[in-house]
């Protein structure tokens, strides 16, 4: 009996990449492949790549080098690079790693079977041309059985001076609401409890779809989508990410307050607290507008959890401008903040500027920001102490098998004693006994919110 071919996928980068990997895994399993955790036992190895940070890109090349050596000993190994590095580098990847069989940009994720058939025909395939994204044609192999990502808009029409995403993920392409709802209904039937709607700029959803309302706004918006999918049977929680401050409206905020399944957690990157830096980044808003958005959210939902992204040491950033970022972080008080020192990316305007800052300055500013972030997150966490929170149980605590772990509506990771086989996928009322900067510990109270 022939042994089934095994595949392995390593994913770098954002939630969009993780969702793409799940879809590609689903295609491979429909083709008869079996998943293996070991990339060196696999017959097909796929690296789904990210270009946002240079260190992630260099790690990909390191992994590829090892697999290229392996392919010399195992010629039937299929070696694939997908995602943003594939899109950006294209055929030049073949010169660097001639052992590659397939190079495919993120727009081609749903075409994996067709592309592999071309590879099996003896071709080295490079698929990076812009296309209209093929609607989901397979069931993704989800990494979780409790929570799931659902893409609602692909691509990005912004042109931030530091970012490669528009060049590698293409222009915005929104899915129609009917397709999104159908995918969520299938997830509900399969027992999933939480869905995160995904987009590079998710609050730009629907701008590219036809039609306007009598009031003159787009017929399809993220706000309308939330109302449309809110009653999907079986889905208990809805989240969305990532939001752009330019498109985050009070109408959207009001909908989130009105719709009980929509969690009070908002991920809205600000990138810098200084208006001159924001202008150089070409972000299209001021720090005053960003503050108004957060104030409006908190006026509707005082307990809302806010997370964001920030970049320090952008080209030309002065000490005073950096301190404006510290001031914004101190005054807003984020529940979580993803921070990074500026990393010049090939093909972006900012990478060509001659006012780059030193690695020493980058390291110093990142350390100072991270110290403040941890301090503010710890302060924000204290509001949970002694409260009862609804926690959706996702898995066992890998560091303590007697505990399960899940997330509150505010997206705070929470641990408590319990049996995973009994509690996985259930929403449990948990009294918080310990509040740390980025996680909570508690005790289950008797009532289960949902069975």
Swiss-Prot record:
It holds the Pfam family TRAM. It is found in: Cytoplasm. Its EC number is 2.8.4.3. It comes from Picosynechococcus sp. (strain ATCC 27264 / PCC 7002 / PR-6) (Agmenellum quadruplicatum). It catalyses: N(6)-dimethylallyladenosine(37) in tRNA + (sulfur carrier)-SH + AH2 + 2 S-adenosyl-L-methionine = 2-methylsulfanyl-N(6)-dimethylallyladenosine(37) in tRNA + (sulfur carrier)-H + 5'-deoxyadenosine + L-methionine + A + S-adenosyl-L-homocysteine + 2 H(+). Keywords: 4Fe-4S, Cytoplasm, Iron, Iron-sulfur, Metal-binding, S-adenosyl-L-methionine, Transferase, tRNA processing. Residues 5-121 form the MTTase N-terminal domain. Catalyzes the methylthiolation of N6-(dimethylallyl)adenosine (i(6)A), leading to the formation of 2-methylthio-N6-(dimethylallyl)adenosine (ms(2)i(6)A) at position 37 in tRNAs that read codons beginning with uridine. Its cofactor is [4Fe-4S] cluster. Residues 142-379 form the Radical SAM core domain. It comes from the Bacteria. The keyword Iron-sulfur applies. GO terms for cellular component: cytoplasm. [4Fe-4S] cluster 1 binds at residues 14, 50, 84. It is an enzyme of class 2 (transferase). PROSITE patterns: MTTASE_N (PS51449), MTTASE_RADICAL (PS01278), RADICAL_SAM (PS51918), TRAM (PS50926). InterPro entries: Elp3/MiaA/NifB-like_rSAM, Methylthiotransferase, Methylthiotransferase_CS, Methylthiotransferase_N, Methylthiotransferase_N_sf, MiaB_methiolase, rSAM, rSAM_horseshoe. This is tRNA-2-methylthio-N(6)-dimethylallyladenosine synthase.
């Amino acid at each position: 009996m022939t042994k089934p071919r095994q595949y392995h996928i390593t994913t770098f980068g954002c939630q969009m990449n993780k969702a793409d990997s799940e879809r590609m895994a689903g295609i491979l399993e429909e083709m008869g492949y079996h998943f293996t955790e070991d990339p060196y036992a696999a017959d097909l190895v796929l690296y789904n790549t990210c270009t946002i940070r240079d260190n992630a890109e260099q790690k990909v090349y390191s992994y590829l080098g090892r697999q290229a050596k392996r392919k010399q000993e195992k010629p039937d190994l299929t070696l694939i690079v997908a995602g943003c590095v594939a899109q950006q580098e294209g055929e030049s990847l073949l010169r660097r790693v001639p052992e590659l069989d397939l190079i495919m940009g993120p727009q081609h994720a749903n075409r994996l079977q067709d592309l592999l058939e071309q590879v099996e025909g003896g071709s080295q395939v490079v698929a990076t041309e812009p296309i209209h994204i093929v609607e989901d044609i397979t069931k993704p192999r989800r990494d979780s059985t409790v929570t799931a990502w659902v893409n609602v808009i692909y691509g990005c029409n912004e042109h931030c001076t530091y970012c490669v995403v528009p060049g590698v993920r293409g222009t915005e392409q929104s899915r129609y609401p009917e397709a999104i709802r159908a995918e969520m209904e299938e997830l509900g039937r399969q027992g999933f409890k939480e869905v995160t709607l995904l987009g590079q700029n998710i609050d730009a959803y629907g701008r590219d779809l036809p039609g306007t309302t009598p009031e003159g706004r787009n017929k399809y918006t993220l706000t309308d989508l939330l109302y449309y999918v809110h009653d999907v049977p079986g889905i208990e929680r809805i989240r969305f990410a990532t939001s752009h401050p330019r498109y985050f409206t009070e109408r959207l905020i009001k909908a989130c307050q009105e719709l009980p399944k929509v969690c009070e957690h908002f991920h809205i990157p600000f990138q810098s607290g200084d208006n001159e830096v924001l202008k150089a980044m070409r972000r299209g808003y001021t720090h005053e507008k960003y503050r108004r958005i957060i104030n409006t959210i908190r006026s509707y939902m005082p307990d809302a959890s806010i997370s964001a992204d920030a970049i320090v040491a952008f080209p030309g950033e002065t000490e005073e401008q950096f301190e404006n970022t510290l001031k914004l972080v101190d005054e807003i008080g984020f529940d979580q903040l993803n921070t990074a020192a500026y990393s010049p990316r090939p093909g972006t305007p900012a990478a060509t500027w001659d006012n780059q800052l030193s690695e020493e300055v980058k390291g110093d500013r990142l350390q100072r920001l991270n110290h403040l972030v941890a301090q503010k997150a710890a302060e924000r966490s204290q509001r949970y102490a002694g409260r009862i929170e609804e926690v959706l149980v996702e898995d066992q605590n890998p560091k303590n098998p007697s505990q399960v772990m899940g997330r509150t509506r505010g997206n705070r990771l929470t641990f408590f004693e319990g049996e995973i086989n009994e509690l996985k996928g259930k929403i449990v009322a948990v009294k918080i006994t310990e509040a740390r900067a980025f996680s909570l510990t508690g005790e289950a109270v008797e009532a289960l919110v949902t069975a």
